[in-house]
Amino acid sequence: MPPRKRRRQCQKAQLLFHQQPLEGPKPHYESHQQPITHTVQVPSKPIDQSTITSWVLPQFDTAAESRFPTHRKHHRDQARHPTRRSTCKFPRLTFESPESSSSETLLLSNREQLQNSEKDAPRRPLVPLFSPQSCGELSVHVPQSLPHVFMPPDIQTPGSSVREDPISPDQKENSLPSCILGPRTPRTPEPGPVLVKDTPEEKYGIKVTWRRRRHLFAYLKERGKLDKSQFLVKT
């Protein structure tokens, strides 16, 4: 077997200096701090703790935070699990304007009514939107809710001076389409502004620079000062 290599000592010996440091021995783990020589005395004024926060509204008072101590560990868990719903620990702010408060109460009551109606209503089987079954249901329910005859948007209705004759429910059902929400033919978009005009046949093969200078081009061509190679495109 080959002889084992001797491990070298990693710790090197401390360097030795012939001269001692001028400022004395320096500590190994502490920075040298200079002594404080210049001190300034500032006149102090007593502070009244009761008047410091007199301008702060009670809803923004820091005492509310002391009632609900913060839990750092809980916040870390929330960051790890973002799907959990976060609950507000601080009291809601109250506003003085009555309009905003009334609108908020109306919104809350409407949401509760919608949730209750969704819970109470029996679940129906899902039906595609444009299936014949859904079209039949729409044609049954729509005539009862519509007071007048359904008119397509493309047909111009007469003015308000023309009186409408009373129509029987049988005629209403016949006049309505089988499915109101049926697919409509898309309207063709109107043509936009012309960005670049087409080149007329007279100017085919002529360079663009001479197309923009028609008077100069005709003048030089009549005088014979332009060769074909100067104004015609090479093919």
Curated annotation (Swiss-Prot):
It comes from the Eukaryota. Residues 66-106, 156-198 are annotated as: Disordered. One of its GO terms (biological process) is double-strand break repair via alternative nonhomologous end joining. Residues 162-173 have a biased composition (Basic and acidic residues). One of its GO terms (cellular component) is chromatin. Pfam families: RHINO. Keywords: Cell cycle, Chromosome, DNA damage, DNA repair, Nucleus, Phosphoprotein, Ubl conjugation. InterPro entries: RHNO1. The RAD1-binding motif mediates interaction with RAD1. Interacts (when phosphorylated by PLK1) with POLQ; promoting POLQ recruitment to DNA damage sites. Interacts with RAD1; interaction is direct and promotes association with the 9-1-1 (RAD9-RAD1-HUS1) complex. Interacts with RAD18. Interacts with TOPBP1. Interacts with UBE2N. This is RAD9, HUS1, RAD1-interacting nuclear orphan protein 1. It comes from Rattus norvegicus (Rat). The gene is Rhno1.
